[in-house]
UniProtKB/Swiss-Prot annotation:
Ca(2+) 4 binds at residues 131, 133, 135, 137, 142. Calcium-binding protein involved in larval development and metamorphosis. Likely to function as calcium buffers mediating the transport of calcium from the sea water to the blastocoel where calcium is required for skeleton formation. Ca(2+) 2 binds at residues 59, 61, 63, 65, 70. This is Calcium-binding protein SPEC 2A. Ca(2+) 1 binds at residues 23, 25, 27, 29, 34.
Length: 150
C-alpha cells in the first residue's frame, strides 16, 4: 500500500501498537465504540454523532469500522497537515525570504518561544545539529528533520 511508504519502519511499528491498543477486541478493526473509548481514555468525551462523522471520514470501504490501512490513511492526513503547518512556520521565520534560516533568524525565534530564553550556546548546539550540509544555514528540509527529531 502506497501510504505505508510515507512512514519509517519505526513509525509503522508505533502506529501498529497504537492501532492494537484502540482495537480492544483484537479483531483487526476499530469500531466507533472502540474509537470513542480511546478518546475517553484521554479524557475527551465526544458525542456519538462526532464519532460517526470521524469514522465516516476514514472508513473508505463502507464497513462502518476502521482497518489498519484506513488507520494509516488517517495518520498520513494528520502528517500532511502538520507538514503544511511546519512549512508555514518556516516561511514566517525566514525574515529575509531567502529560503533558509540564518543563525540569527533561528536565534530570534528560539529566544522568543522559550521561557526562560535559550542561551546562545544552546541555540548554537541546535543549529549545529540541524545543519546537515554544513552551510551554516537551516533549509526547509533540515528544519523539518529538526522538528521531527525533537
Amino acid at each position: 500500500m502506497a501510504v505505508q511508504l510515507l512512514f519509517t519502519e519505526e513509525e509503522k511499528a508505533l502506529f501498529k501498537s497504537s492501532f492494537k491498543s484502540e482495537d480492544t477486541d483484537g479483531d483487526g478493526k476499530i469500531t466507533s465504540e472502540e474509537l470513542r473509548a480511546a478518546f475517553k481514555s484521554i479524557e475527551i468525551d465526544l458525542t456519538q454523532e462526532k464519532i460517526d462523522e470521524m469514522m465516516g471520514m476514514v472508513d473508505k470501504d463502507g464497513s462502518k469500522d476502521m482497518d489498519f490501512s484506513e488507520f494509516l490513511m488517517r495518520k498520513a492526513e494528520q502528517w500532511r497537515g502538520r507538514e503544511v503547518q511546519l512549512t508555514k512556520a518556516f516561511v514566517d521565520l525566514d525574515k529575509d525570504h531567502n529560503g533558509s534560516l540564518s543563525p540569527q533568524e533561528l536565534r530570534t525565534a528560539m529566544s522568543a518561544c522559550t521561557d526562560p530564553p535559550m542561551t546562545e550556546k544552546e541555540i548554537d548546539a541546535i543549529i549545529e545539529k540541524a545543519d546537515c550540509n554544513g552551510d551554516g544555514k537551516i533549509c526547509l528540509e533540515e528544519f523539518m528533520k529538526l522538528i521531527h527529531s525533537s
